[in-house]
Amino acid sequence: MTIAAAPPSSRFRAVRIWLTLVAALIAVMVLVGGATRLTESGLSIVEWKPVTGSLPPLTDTQWHAAFDGYKQIPQYRELNAGMTLDQFKTIFWWEWSHRLLGRVIGIVYLLPFLWFLWRGAIGPEWKRALWIIFALGALQGAVGWWMVASGLSQRTEVSQVRLATHLSLALIIYAAIVWTLRRMADGARVAAPVRLRVTALALLGLTFVQLYAGALVAGLRAGRLYNTWPEIDGALIPDAARLWFESPWWKNLFDNHLTVQFDHRMLAYALWTLAALHMIDALRTRAAARGAVQLFLALTAQATLGIFTVLYAAPIDLALVHQAMALVVLTLAVLQAERLTATRKDRTARDRGAAGRLAIPSEPFPSA
């Protein structure tokens, strides 16, 4: 049920169109990053040049220089010795495209943001949030290089912990933008019991934990192992000695292929169960029921994709669909949490912080 509707406003539409574009670009970048990882292309560029690195090699000499740099790292020597220049170009373009998208996102975010600030289109409440998002984006570039650097000296791949950190930060930025878009939208304030609000926030938090766990699975390539379901390693619950053989025990949570995949499965079961309970509660109280149903259905589809990804040993196409569906789940979880936790004060804050001269007749993001 709803108890109060915010007055229609077009004052944030231009800002929302801009933020929707940024969110879409981040989603594309996450998928390109996934393809870069799955094709084992992430270490093909061994230098970090935030400005001059935007240009790819343009001559044979430059291509050979880039290839020679790749030949110096363990991944080439131990896994790809004998690779041809044409084969190197294939993995190079994936990593270069991923980095280029990062630069494009930075420009698409910063330049309109400065313009909106200059025009007075963004009030104090949103300025702070949007500057924080920009700072997180700048940090993400450094985290990306920190991740790549982990695979340049001793390892033949990047650290799965750093990979998970890199992906998690991208998803935090994406979620922050979606949350801001939803809060800027015209919509009714939902009257719901505290229990429903708490479970919506719990679903969002657990979704982030699950996404981090999934990134660990991807970084370890653990999805190519234990390709049975519902059993894993021959049992519903593997032997404790195999789950916890690393010392100290907590290393198993990050380094043990079996433990990492088992955790990812258990978190999926917990998330699906919580979403089902949340949906039942929402249907019973008629509070944000549509959002609860959408989230539950998305999680059901994602769980199904996850099962098939495991059974088929994580082929690239299926793994990418699984990752794309994770973005859908995160989007719906953010929208549901914001919908149920927004207060009347939050809903009217936009009217204090917007300028009316930037109206664009569009509705780029769902408002209910």
UniProtKB/Swiss-Prot annotation:
One cellular component (GO) term of this entry: plasma membrane
Sequence positions that bind heme: 264, 322
Entry keyword annotation includes Methyltransferase: no
Membrane topology: Multi-pass membrane protein
Principal EC category: oxidoreductase
Keywords: Cell membrane, Heme biosynthesis, Iron, Membrane, Metal-binding, Oxidoreductase, Transmembrane, Transmembrane helix
Required cofactor names: heme b
GO biological process, one term: heme A biosynthetic process
Membrane-spanning residues: 14-34, 104-124, 129-149, 161-181, 200-220, 266-283, 296-316, 318-338
UniProt GO MF annotations: metal ion binding; oxidoreductase activity, acting on NAD(P)H, heme protein as acceptor
InterPro entries noted in UniProt: COX15/CtaA_fam (IPR003780), HemeA_Synthase_type2 (IPR023754)
Subcellular location: Cell membrane
Known EC number: 1.17.99.9
Disulfide linkage: none
Keyword Transferase in annotation: no
Catalytic activity: Fe(II)-heme o + 2 A + H2O = Fe(II)-heme a + 2 AH2
Involved pathway(s): Porphyrin-containing compound metabolism; heme A biosynthesis; heme A from heme O: step 1/1
Subunit field text: Interacts with CtaB.
Family statement: Belongs to the COX15/CtaA family. Type 2 subfamily.
Name used for this protein in its record: Heme A synthase
Organism: Rhodopseudomonas palustris (strain ATCC BAA-98 / CGA009)
Gene assigned in the entry: ctaA
